Amino acid sequence: MTRSTWIGSPALMMSIWFATAPGSLGQAPATPPIRVGMIGLDTSHTVAFAKIFREAKPGETSVARLKLVAAYPGGSSDIPSSANRIAGYTKELRDSGVEIVDSVEALLDRVDAVLITSLDGRTHLAQAIPVFQAGKPCFIDKPLAADLADALAVQMAAEKFQGRWFTSSSLRFTPTIWRYRQNTNRKILGAHAWSPCSLEPHHNDLAWYGIHGIEALYTAMGPGCRTVIRTFNAGSDVSVGTWEDGRVGVFRGIREGLQGYGLSVFGSDFIENDAKYEGYEPLVGQIADFLGGGNQPVANQESIEIMAFIEAAQISGRQGGIPVALDETMAKAKVEAEKRLQVHLSKNSKQ
């Protein structure tokens, strides 16, 4: 074949193009990584999540697409468990190759998606607003907020700026708990969940750590709680919710004696109490799917209802254990949420 014949052979030229072009037969197009940024390096979740990202094997899990590229330390000086840990976790991430930046805005310039991992729920609203404004999908670690008004303000901000977000405790997606949401053919009549329930004075009592057990309770029961009553003492907490269909769900918070996580579920033809915590990997898998454009694994409205359950329990405990309606609690908090959001938006506009 002469040089002129080789150049002029359409079939040959086409075969060479197919053999070498990206995405050609035999060569799948490379899936670009999702550049992730973390806001808040004062919790063990940060280094645990980062380790799962690093160890994920391409082709086996969507987590392998996540690449932690930047982080903003944040931190809260008035919470010792935040202030005392932030330097260590920041160093650990920096040493692993993560760029540490000095502002949320600097982080947003470098990433495709965000994890708000700040330990302090009071900081989440201010941190989430610029993330929503930048159009980045966002996972907000527990607790969503310190109280219901802030949680509602997060949702209002997301609606205003069309932000995509979800929040969850890792307990929700542990397989022996998540199965109750996956298999909707089993009739659940009630559930009893428990978890450690340490207190933090800047948060509603059940928001700080009781959120884990309440999230497990809601995974089994689903949304639709109407009233909550709470009994409280130094060593324990018991909150009883009545759902709109008459079912009853119970959360027991443990502060004294042996502590652990658990869930008993009472069904029409079964009683099961074999739920157990199985680590962060199931949650991180859900985060990866969501940040990659997948469906939202927990409806925002359900997360807001969980915060309303917590606030109603707070009110009930202060008033001697009277029943407190979630819809009334939500209505009062909404007024405060609108005020708080406007304050934050005004601050942002002046910067």
Enumerate the predicted regions with their spans.
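A contiguous active-site-proximal alpha/beta segment in oxidoreductase catalytic domains
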Residues: L144-H203
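Short helix/strand-capping hinge loops at secondary-structure junctions
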Residues: G135-P137, K142-P143
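N-terminal glycine-/serine-/threonine-rich beta1-alpha1-beta2 phosphate-ribose binding loop
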Residues: R3, L25-A134, M156, K160, ...
